Amino acid sequence: MNRREFSTSFLLGLSAVAISANAVAQASRGSAGAASKLPTVKARNIVLVHGLFADGSSWSEVIPRLQAKGLNVTSVQNPLTTLPEAVDACRRVLDRQDGPTVLVGHSFSGMIVTEAGVHPNVSALVYVAARAPDAGEDYTALAKKYPTPPASKGVVFDGDEGRLTEEAFVRDFAGDLPRERALALYAVQEPFKKALLTGKTTNAAWRQKPSFYAVSTEDRTIDPDLERFMAKRMNAQTIELRSSHVSLISHPVEITDLILRAAG
């Protein structure tokens, strides 16, 4: 596989063992609908998980707004090595919470939220332009039903580490930010390991927990219609923002409000 093919496959996503479409549809009609009707538990803890091409500081516009509401906020430093290691890092933070917790994921970390979100401390889930696979779902096959996102052409590898080029980061990842701000974020971009792409999800926490989703209508990293499909499938309370992939930075007020809604 050449670099471009691998890059495209990456952004379309890799996960879990394939299961039948009928099984997915039946399960989604069942427990996902039930989860959406669960009452939202009052939570004072918020755990934020960043995606690829970023680090925990990507939540810097949201964190102070949540703290101003008296919430206890933790931003997980995702190791970006393997999915199990990333999930373990998230679980360790969840273990430290003293009660109901809203778990929030951006982009690729929707995989982490979906897997770790079954933790007993998690009261609700928030997906910000994020992947939301079903348990055992072939995310690649699902994503291939939608147009290939433009950012896929900008993923490059140095050995087993991948990252976005400066041009792709500014144009396709953070396209609605001032160039200076986008370049500052590019400077702290964390590389990811190829092994991260082979991870398999075994849980679908959105089947069990109330879920919320922020669709980015101008997203060039995950197709917006794929985001809409995943949000609808989990019967999430959904908002749409005229935003690039990084709505947590370009639309922090709206993202904060969605998290507060999930917190009850």
Label each region the model flagged.
Residues 43-83:
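Conserved HGGG/HGGXW glycine-rich cap/lid loop of the alpha/beta-hydrolase fold
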Residues 105, 109, 113:
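Gly/Ala-rich beta-loop-alpha elbow adjacent to hydrolase catalytic centers
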Residues 5-26:
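N-terminal export signals
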Residues 1, 20-42:
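C-terminal segment of N-terminal export signals and the immediately downstream linker at the start
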Residues 122, 126-159, 193:
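Flexible "cap/lid" loop of the alpha/beta hydrolase fold
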Residues 193-234, 239-243, 248:
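Conserved serine/cysteine hydrolase catalytic core
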Residues 67, 72-102, 116-119, 139-144:
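Active-site loop/oxyanion-hole signature of alpha/beta-hydrolase fold enzymes
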Residues 249-261:
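Post-His helix in hydrolase/transferase enzymes
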